[in-house]
Amino acid sequence: MVAEGLCQCYIRRMSTGGPHGAAPDRSCLARDTEGRSPCKNCQGCTQGAADPIPIRILMADSDVEQAPSVSVLPRNKILILAPAGKAYQAEVIRDLFNIEASESDRIVRDVKWSNKYYEVDLDLYIDSYESLQTWGAEFCSDECADLRDVVAGIFLVFEETEDAETFQQLIEDCHFTDERVLVACDLSSAEHPASLERALEVHDVALVRWRERGTNELGEQQGRERVRELLDIHPWSERMLRMHASTAAALAELDPLQADIPLDSVVTRIKQARERYLEITDVHAADEYAARIAHELTEQLLPE
């Protein structure tokens, strides 16, 4: 796997800045078909199995190019991204996952995400940027296609509106074809134009004011609870999920007619309805539209 192409020397330098100096050499990725050869740049460390680091990888080695796709890895990686020199990621990780991440952490493995229905293991990737535009150009490049494939979600933690606007373009440039948990977590208290939220929603990016609580005028959760909700409803691969006993029993008793309803069509319908709702300027008309959509979905999901 390409993941094995990341030598332990490279992983150490990404995590600690040593032993070869503070600046990691991103080309330290050589491997042979056995996954155990010394890396060309270090000539001393050996390859070991490791998950991909969410930064640009130089695919210059022919055997790296010919290695099987990293997509065989589970898509359970959450990339948490923030400006360099800030500790924003630590706050989000603490509030959302109830764990402490140090400044030197780059990967936090086997983080359990659990609700009353299921449990799933996630890996957190922690990265930062000097320029989000430059970072995005690397991450969205063809060389990082396999890495993007294992990322289930990207959380941008920001204070500057310009970063949220750049994030919108970044997601567009990545051309994701499958659903991801995409969140722009705003730690500031500044007001953003409604056009920004709509522009992000076009690319399925949720704009979340991290420190807000409760629900908004649409009855939707805000702040960290909104992000928890997005993680809960994400369609994780069945082979990753561990259903709680009560959930498994309920699924076993589900009416086969209801079980045949494609969930993705329902989710798409809800997203389209939300976009249309936000475009309606008349409050009364918007409420009528919301009530009609709710009735239609109820008829579809719970037929008499």
Swiss-Prot record:
TM ranges: none
Cystine residue pairs: none
InterPro entries noted in UniProt: Irc6 (IPR034627)
Biological processes, Gene Ontology terms: vesicle-mediated transport
Keywords: Chromosomal rearrangement
One of the record's GO molecular function terms: protein-macromolecule adaptor activity
Described purpose of this protein according to its UniProt entry: Involved in gross chromosomal rearrangements (GCRs) and telomere healing.
Protein name per its UniProtKB record: Increased recombination centers protein 6
Source organism: Eremothecium gossypii (strain ATCC 10895 / CBS 109.51 / FGSC 9923 / NRRL Y-1056)
Gene this protein is translated from: IRC6
